[in-house]
UniProtKB/Swiss-Prot annotation:
The protein's name in its UniProt record: Protein HesA, heterocyst
GO molecular function, one term: ubiquitin-like modifier activating enzyme activity
Any Gene Ontology CC annotation: cytoplasm
Domain of life: Bacteria
UniProt keyword list: Heterocyst, Nitrogen fixation
Family, similarity comment: Belongs to the HesA/MoeB/ThiF family.
Database matches in SUPFAM superfamilies: Activating enzymes of the ubiquitin-like proteins
Amino acid sequence: MINLTPTELERYSRQMMLPNFGEAAQKRLKSATVLVTGVGGLGGTAALYLAVAGVGRLILVRGGDLRLDDMNRQVLMTDDWVGKPRVFKAKETLQAINPDIQIETIHDYVTSDNVDSLVQSADMALDCAHNFTERDLLNSACVRWRKPMVEAAMDGMEAYLTTIIPGVTPCLSCIFPEKPEWDRRGFSVLGAVSGTLACLTALEAIKLITGFSQPLLSQLLTIDLNRMEFAKRRLYRDRSCPVCGNDAPWRYAQSNSMETSSNCTHS
């Protein structure tokens, strides 16, 4: 059984004071592996709060190099790192903040070639990728391998958030069967907005891992930060969904040897 060191007991003592948290929840965090895709203003900040909360292992996935116009929101980066792979700087910063956790970096985007191995390596995923191609790949793999996924996205002053449990809640394709047009350089972003959503995303993951509070299951949280309005909308599974529906291909391809274990809890 996993134990907490004296250093960890002191480091996390304030959060262990929360109702329904305690050492049991902290041990679940230490035992967990979380995959974070799109380690930018959203994913990088979410990874920061998972790291300081004591998630035992993070897998950070992001291709490409840091750009100067990333610096208004990517809090793990420094100005001297512009032009270099951001995922390595993310690890360096997080490891300096919390040396007790393990961090693995993948300098690549989510692709059809790597998505299954990435998802199988983790207990759950945070979908913070910057395009729907990667998001759809991750969604399909999480459904296939029965791994929970926190889905978070933003544009300008608006954002949305939900938690997906394969076989229990709608998947991303149920929620967004039609994909919006997207321009990687054409969307506006303010660091305080991506940071707000990132904190909520990390909190969803912590709730899911520990079970200390109820996550957003079958609910879509929509956020309008212009008006400071938060609303929740009920979501329903699409039984004919090509990804998670009753006739989805993975249902016929799965075998008894498929690894679907997860340290996450949900109710």
